[in-house]
Design a protein with these regions (language model features):
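Hydrophobic transmembrane alpha-helices that form the core helical bundles
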Residues: 52-53, 62-145, 150, 170, ...
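TM-loop-TM module centered on a large, flexible mid-protein loop between adjacent transmembrane helices
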Residues: 83, 90, 121-122, 195-198, ...
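Membrane-interface "cap" regions at the ends of multi-pass membrane proteins
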Residues: 1-39, 43-48, 62-66, 78, ...
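Helix-loop-helix junctions that connect adjacent transmembrane segments
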Residues: 7-13, 51, 125-128, 160-295
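Helix-loop-helix connectors at the membrane interface of multi-pass transporters/channels
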Residues: 1, 8, 82-87, 92, ...
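Hydrophobic alpha-helical segments of multi-pass membrane transport proteins
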Residues: 143, 166-172, 316, 369-399, ...
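Membrane-interface loop-to-helix entry segments
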Residues: 117, 131-189, 219-220, 243-244, ...
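C-terminal membrane-solvent junction of multi-pass transporters and transport-like membrane proteins
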Residues: 157-158, 328-339, 379-431
Length: 458
C-alpha cells in the first residue's frame, strides 16, 4: 500500500498554510464550550473537579491528535477521519462517523447561535433569542461563501482576537487571585482557596465523570486540522507544525483559564445562563470590562461557528465524493466552496435552532450533550483507524518511511480508545446529559443499518 496516492477528486484549492490550520482549529475549539459550558462544569463537578476534568480532556485530545497526525500526513485528503475509518475500519463505520460528525456540528452550530443570542440579551434584554440567532447564522453562512484563501484569513483574524482576549483574561484573573486587583466579596487575596472550598469532589466521582461530555464538547474542533489537509499547501510540513502548536496553545489556554475561573467563581454561582467570564470581570470591577468581554465572546462564537460550518460542509462533500450520498453534493463552485453541502448543513442547523429557542436553559445543555457524544464517536474512530492503517502499512513498508509517527503504537492508540470509552460511559450518570445517548445511539445504529441496506456491506 502506498501512502501518497490519496488525492481529492474535486477542485479544492490548496491555499492554507500551517498558521491557517492552527487558527482554523483554534477557531473551532474556543466557543461556547469554554465560554459558557465551563460554568456548568464548575457547578456540577466543583472547582477542583472542573480543573481535573479539563486536564483529563486535554490529555485525551492530545492522544487523539497523535493518531490523526500520522493519518493526515500519510493521506492528506478532505474528509480526513471519515475516509480513514472507511478504509481501515469498515465502510459502514466511515459512513456512520461522517454523519455523526456532521450531526455534531449541526447541533453545535445551533447551540453556538443560541449562546450568542443569550449574550446579546445583556444589551438587548427585550429582543427574542431567535432574532439574534438568525443574524449570527446569516453572518456565518456569508463568511463561508468566501474562497478558502479569504476564508482562512478571516478565520485567522477572528481567532486571533479571542486568543489575545483569553490571554488578557488569564492575566487579569491571576492579578485578582493574588490580590493585586480587587475582587468583589473578598478583603484579602482569594488565592486558590475556592478550588477546594467545597471539597475536592463535592458531587463525588460521579460528578466528575458526568461532566466529561461537556469537556469533550469544549475541545471539539481541534480535529479540523485533519479535515482541512485536502486544502493545505505542503501538508507533510504544515500538518505536524499545526498539530504541535495548536495542542500546546489549547492545553495552556484551557487549563489556565479553568484554574482562574475555578479560583474566582463560587460553585453556587456557576451555570450556563450567564458567561462565567463576564461574572468574573464584573466582580473585578473593571469599567465596561464585562461588556468588552461579552463582545469578545461573541466574536469567539462567530469564529467557532464559521469553522463548524466549514467542517460540516466538507464532511458532506467527502461522503458525496465517495459515492455514499448524492453526487450532486460533490459539486464545488468557482470559489472552491461546496455550496450545496453548506446549504444542506444550514438547513439542519435551522431545524435544531428552532427546537432550542423556547427553552435555552435546558435545550442548550441537551444540544451540547448530543454534540459532545457525536464528537467522541468521531474521535474514537481516529485511533482505531490509525491502528488499522499502521497494520496495513507495515505489510509493505517500514515505520521509518512515515513522515509523522504516533509514538508507542499500537499501545498509545489503544489507551486513547479506552479513555474515550470511559468518557462515553460517564454520560449515563448525568440526567441532563443523557440526551446524547438517547439521540446519538439510535442515530448511530440507524447509519449502520441504512448503509447496509443501501450498499450491502457493513
Amino acid at each position: 500500500m502506498e501512502n501518497h496516492n490519496f488525492e481529492n477528486q474535486g477542485t479544492f484549492n490548496r491555499e492554507m498554510n500551517s498558521r491557517h490550520l492552527q487558527m482554523l482549529s483554534i477557531g473551532g475549539v474556543i466557543g461556547t464550550g469554554l465560554f459558557l459550558s465551563s460554568g456548568y462544569t464548575i457547578a456540577q463537578a466543583g472547582p477542583f473537579g472542573a480543573v481535573a476534568a479539563y486536564l483529563f480532556g486535554a490529555v485525551m485530545v492530545y492522544l487523539v491528535m497523535f493518531s490523526l497526525g500520522e493519518l493526515s500526513v500519510a493521506m492528506p485528503v478532505t474528509g480526513s477521519f471519515h475516509t480513514y475509518a472507511t478504509k481501515f475500519i469498515s465502510p459502514g463505520t466511515g459512513f456512520m462517523v461522517a454523519w455523526m460528525y456532521w450531526l455534531c456540528w449541526v447541533v453545535a452550530l445551533a447551540s453556538q447561535f443560541v449562546g450568542a443570542a443569550q449574550l446579546m440579551q445583556r444589551w438587548f434584554p427585550s429582543v427574542p433569542i431567535w432574532v439574534f440567532a438568525t443574524i449570527f447564522a446569516v453572518i456565518v453562512f456569508g463568511l463561508n461563501t468566501l474562497s478558502v484563501g479569504w476564508f482562512a484569513k478571516a478565520e485567522d483574524a477572528l481567532s486571533s482576537i479571542k486568543v489575545y482576549a483569553i490571554a488578557a483574561f488569564i492575566v487579569l484573573g491571576t492579578l485578582a487571585i493574588f490580590g493585586i486587583l480587587p475582587f468583589e466579596g473578598t478583603n484579602a487575596a482569594p488565592l486558590f482557596n475556592n478550588i477546594t472550598s467545597n471539597g475536592l469532589l463535592p458531587n463525588g466521582l460521579v460528578g466528575l465523570i458526568s461532566v466529561m461530555l461537556s469537556v469533550n464538547y469544549a475541545f471539539s474542533g481541534v480535529e479540523m486540522i485533519g479535515i482541512a489537509t485536502g486544502e493545505t499547501d505542503n501538508p507533510q510540513k504544515a500538518v505536524p507544525q499545526a498539530i504541535k502548536s495548536t495542542i500546546g496553545l489549547l492545553v495552556i489556554f484551557f487549563v489556565l483559564t479553568i484554574v482562574v475561573l475555578a479560583s474566582l467563581l463560587p460553585m453556587s454561582e456557576a451555570g450556563v445562563t450567564e458567561a462565567p467570564f463576564v461574572l468574573v470581570l464584573d466582580k473585578i470591577g473593571f469599567p465596561y470590562a464585562a461588556d468588552i468581554m461579552n463582545f469578545i465572546i461573541l466574536t469567539a462564537i462567530l469564529s467557532a461557528s464559521t469553522s463548524g460550518l466549514y467542517a460540516s460542509s466538507r464532511m458532506l462533500w467527502s461522503l458525496a465524493n465517495e459515492g455514499m450520498i448524492s453526487k450532486e453534493l460533490v459539486k464545488i463552485n468557482k470559489h472552491g466552496v461546496p455550496m450545496r453541502g453548506m446549504i444542506l448543513s444550514m438547513i439542519g442547523v435551522v431545524i435544531a435552532l428552532i427546537a432550542s429557542i423556547y427553552a435555552e436553559d435546558t435545550i442548550f445543555l441537551a444540544l451540547v450533550s448530543i454534540a459532545g457524544f457525536a464528537v467522541v464517536i468521531a474521535w474514537l474512530a481516529i485511533p482505531l483507524a490509525q491502528i488499522g492503517f499502521r497494520r496495513e502499512f507495515l505489510k509493505t513498508h517500514s515505520v521509518d518511511e512515515l513522515e509523522y509517527k504516533t509514538p508507542f503504537s499500537p499501545t498509545l492508540p489503544w489507551i486513547t480508545v479506552i479513555l474515550l470509552v470511559i468518557s462515553i460511559i460517564g454520560i449515563g450518570w448525568d440526567p441532563s446529559q443523557r440526551a446524547g445517548l438517547y439521540f446519538g445511539v439510535p442515530f448511530m445504529i440507524g447509519c449502520y443499518i441504512y448503509h447496509y441496506i443501501r450498499f450491502k456491506k457493513w
